[in-house]
C-alpha cells in the first residue's frame, strides 16, 4: 500500500503535523476498510490560503475548509474476506490551522482533529457522504470508531468528537 503524507503547511504550534502518525492512521483506516494492499493514497497538509483557493476552485465556496477529498478510481471498501480492487484511491487535503480552531471549539487536541479529518477524507474517497442525516450519522460514527481504534492500538489516550464544518456529533453516537 502506497501512502504519501506531505506537510506543506506552516502550522507550527508545537511540532507541526506528525506526518508519521498520520501515515499510520491512514494505513489503519485502509486496512479496517479492507482496501486493496496495492491502493495508493496521498495526504497533503496545506495553509489557509491554499485551502481557500481549493475550496473556491472545486466547491465554489469562499474561505478555507477543514478537509477536501479528491477521488481518483472510485474505489469502495472491501467486504468480509475480500479487499477492494487495486487502484488510485485519491488525495486528501487538510488545513491544520482550521483543524486547530475546530479542536479548540470541541475541546480536544489538534493532533486528534487532524486524525479525524484524515479519516473523514479517506471515507469520502471510499464513497461515504454526509449530505443526509442518516449518511452523516453513519459516516461520523465510523470515522470516530476508526480513530478511537487507531488511538487504542498505538496506546495513546484520546476521545475526539468528530467535527466537520464546525458541527460536532455528540460523543455518545
Swiss-Prot record:
It comes from the Bacteria. Keywords: Cytoplasm, Endonuclease, Hydrolase, Metal-binding, Nuclease, Ribosome biogenesis, rRNA processing, Zinc. One of its GO terms (biological process) is rRNA processing. InterPro entries: MetalPrtase_cat_dom_sf_prd (IPR023091), YbeY (IPR002036), YbeY_CS (IPR020549). GO terms for molecular function: metalloendopeptidase activity; RNA endonuclease activity; zinc ion binding. Its EC number is 3.1.-.-. Pfam families: YbeY. The keyword Cytoplasm applies. It is found in: Cytoplasm. Binds 1 zinc ion. The keyword Cytoplasm applies. Zn(2+) binds at residues 120, 124, 130. Its main location: cytoplasm. Its cofactor is Zn(2+). GO terms for cellular component: cytoplasm. Belongs to the endoribonuclease YbeY family. Single strand-specific metallo-endoribonuclease involved in late-stage 70S ribosome quality control and in maturation of the 3' terminus of the 16S rRNA. This is Endoribonuclease YbeY. It comes from Kineococcus radiotolerans (strain ATCC BAA-149 / DSM 14245 / SRS30216). The gene is ybeY.
Amino acid at each position: 500500500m502506497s501512502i504519501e503524507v506531505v506537510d506543506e503547511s506552516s502550522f507550527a504550534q508545537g511540532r507541526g503535523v506528525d506526518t508519521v502518525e498520520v501515515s499510520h492512521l491512514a494505513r489503519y483506516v485502509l486496512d479496517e476498510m479492507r482496501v486493496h494492499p496495492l491502493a495508493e493514497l496521498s495526504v497533503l497538509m496545506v495553509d489557509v490560503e491554499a485551502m481557500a483557493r481549493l475550496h473556491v476552485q472545486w466547491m465554489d465556496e469562499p474561505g478555507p475548509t477543514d478537509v477536501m477529498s479528491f477521488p481518483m478510481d472510485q474505489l469502495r471498501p472491501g467486504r468480509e474476506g475480500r479487499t477492494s480492487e487495486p487502484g488510485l484511491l485519491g488525495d486528501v487535503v487538510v488545513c491544520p490551522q482550521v483543524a486547530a480552531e475546530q479542536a479548540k471549539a470541541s475541546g480536544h487536541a489538534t493532533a486528534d482533529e487532524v486524525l479525524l479529518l484524515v479519516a473523514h477524507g479517506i471515507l469520502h474517497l471510499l464513497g461515504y457522504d454526509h449530505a443526509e442525516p442518516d449518511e452523516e450519522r453513519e459516516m461520523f460514527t465510523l470515522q470516530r470508531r476508526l480513530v478511537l481504534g487507531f488511538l487504542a492500538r498505538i496506546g495513546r489516550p484520546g476521545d475526539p468528537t468528530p467535527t466537520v464544518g464546525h458541527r460536532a456529533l455528540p460523543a455518545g453516537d
